[in-house]
Amino acid sequence: MAYSNFIIDFTLTDTAPVTEPVTLAEAKLYCRVTTSVDDNQISLMIKQAREAVEVGTGLSLIPKTAVVWFTNWNSAFELPYGPVNSITSLINEQGDTIAVGDYTLIGGKFPKLIRPSYQNLKFTYTCGYTTIPNDLKIAILDQVSYDYENRGLDSNTGICEKT
């Protein structure tokens, strides 16, 4: 079943100091780098690769707080980032808090909120993995390796074709 959200506004904020899912040591080992000359550059590449994977998958790899204002004619709302860790609040357009028993959260990685009546809602929740799945970690490492191998090229480099 397809859901058709209309997201009115959306913010995504890191909930704590960011600890990247791939360490500098892991990235250097994967890229076969033995010196520390490029450590700063590789650290930036790790962050960029993680952000690219998050955008490409719609998943939050590190803990974040999401605040979404949205509306939907069929009362089923696709949340823009998963997995959901906890629900902070669900508020209707009048500013009233909606009780936990009045909605259902379904799904894991790509959650949906089911609400029995149509209206605009503000949903605040925390999302992100506590342990990153290996396939996503490899995707980050592949992207870092690709970026590192192609650094300094004049052409526009994009997403690693391997993943």
Positions of predicted regions on the chain:
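Divalent metal-cofactor coordination and adjacent catalytic microenvironments
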Residues: 1-163
